[in-house]
Amino acid sequence: MIKGRRTKLHTFLYDCFLIFAFMVGLPRILYKRFVHGKYTKSLGIRFGFKKPEVPGTGPVAWFHGASVGETALLLPLLKRFMKEYPEWRCVVTSCTESGHENAHRLFGPLGVTTFILPLDLSIIIKPVVRAISPSLLVFSEGDCWLNFIEEAKRLGATAVIINGKLSANSCKRFTILKRFGRNYFSPVDGFLLQDEQHKARFLQLGVDKEKIQVTGNIKTYTETLSENNQRDYWREKLQLAQDTELLVLGSVHPKDVEVWLPVVRELRRNLKVLWVPRHIERSKELEALLSKENISYGLWSKEATFAQHDAIIVDAIGWLKQLYSAADLAFVGGTFDDRIGGHNLLEPLQCGVPLIFGPHIQSQSDLAERLLSMGAGCCLDKTNIVKVITFLLDHPEERAAYIQKGAMFLHEEKVAFDRTWESFKRYIPCVKI
């Protein structure tokens, strides 16, 4: 029996909680389904009507991440895993449609099975887990689901969290239900965490300290796209002249757009802008706003280029990182919205591009502080944004300094991946083929 395993009553109460949460969110789900067309492809698998199949023979390693960023960080680890353990079959799941689409794009060419994780109701998830029968579970950053992991553990799987983190808010919620917190994490065999702060939070919830290792943040370890051929390729594809400046506004939310529209209007120089909304269903709203400002724009889906337009809206998923490499400056969205707290601050650095972001970075405050202390990023506020952008565009040597510091940051952090991999190998079970 798994230490700390929940009773049938715990499972029943947990299922009741999920049903209650689902009913509370149902109006929003229906709105997105019928107004924005979301969830059309995922309902069958989410409710267990469609059973995923994993072709081939051999043990199964099941990797899971909540959404786009969490699944993307699995790529280098999974590539290494497939190279050193070719007898294993691999599965990658995500909780969101955007995460699944990105996972399919990244992992599909590698022969990896990808699908959206079904709802964690015991009656739905347990038959799926039994059908796949994984020998290894790998959770990106800690997006564990109780019925999912408990059923896999019952079948003998090993479970490990990589790049693990626990926010202060999540820690508070688990602390209120401390006993529940212990049960939540007790089935996990290993915790490979980002830093000591996250370790302290897991310990506070009663996780066995022998299970925990601080291996570093592996979001910093992906293939760098900053080589000249990448930059030149994307600038040529976008039809950008050599002396034309490009500002990429990545993963922007409405509040980011609200800040940037007057800035772009005021700058009005030899500057092109690539708008990448966090949610592509907001592309129509962005089109209306640009039209209102008399800004000439085209759509990425229509193969628009800057030869005809001053702005391009990227109305497709999965292109942001490649397009960052063409930029002279890259802004990371969600950082002018205090409800969001920012997205992946590292992607511009990995593309060899100067990083700028707004003041709301609470979702990754530790990382932002490290970047700022090293001079690898620039934090803007609404009062100085035009002045700072103008200064950076007028002084290429300042942009070059940001790029250099960013490269140093990534080089120093690369060792985190090596530490994570060496620790992760200890949890890969020896399975008879």
UniProtKB/Swiss-Prot annotation:
It catalyses: lipid IVA (E. coli) + CMP-3-deoxy-beta-D-manno-octulosonate = alpha-Kdo-(2->6)-lipid IVA (E. coli) + CMP + H(+); alpha-Kdo-(2->6)-lipid IVA (E. coli) + CMP-3-deoxy-beta-D-manno-octulosonate = alpha-Kdo-(2->4)-alpha-Kdo-(2->6)-lipid IVA (E. coli) + CMP + H(+); alpha-Kdo-(2->4)-alpha-Kdo-(2->6)-lipid IVA (E. coli) + CMP-3-deoxy-beta-D-manno-octulosonate = alpha-Kdo-(2->8)-alpha-Kdo-(2->4)-alpha-Kdo-(2->6)-lipid IVA (E. coli) + CMP + H(+); alpha-Kdo-(2->8)-alpha-Kdo-(2->4)-alpha-Kdo-(2->6)-lipid IVA (E. coli) + CMP-3-deoxy-beta-D-manno-octulosonate = alpha-Kdo-(2->8)-[alpha-Kdo-(2->4)]-alpha-Kdo-(2->4)-alpha-Kdo-(2->6)-lipid IVA + CMP + H(+). It is a single-pass membrane protein. GO terms for cellular component: plasma membrane. It is an enzyme of class 2 (transferase). Keywords: Cell inner membrane, Cell membrane, Lipopolysaccharide biosynthesis, Membrane, Signal-anchor, Transferase, Transmembrane, Transmembrane helix. The record marks 141, 219 as: Transition state stabilizer. CMP binds at residues 277-278, 317-319, 344-347. It comes from the Bacteria. The chain crosses the membrane at residues 11-31. One of its GO terms (biological process) is lipid A biosynthetic process. One of its GO terms (molecular function) is Kdo transferase activity. InterPro entries: Glycos_transf_N, Glycos_transf_N_sf, Kdotransferase. Pathway: Bacterial outer membrane biogenesis; LPS core biosynthesis. Its EC number is 2.4.99.12, 2.4.99.13, 2.4.99.14, 2.4.99.15. Gene3D superfamilies: 3-Deoxy-D-manno-octulosonic-acid transferase, N-terminal domain, Glycogen Phosphorylase B. The keyword Lyase does not apply. Its main location: membrane. Pfam families: Glycos_transf_N. Belongs to the glycosyltransferase group 1 family. Glycosyltransferase 30 subfamily. This is 3-deoxy-D-manno-octulosonic acid transferase. The gene is waaA.
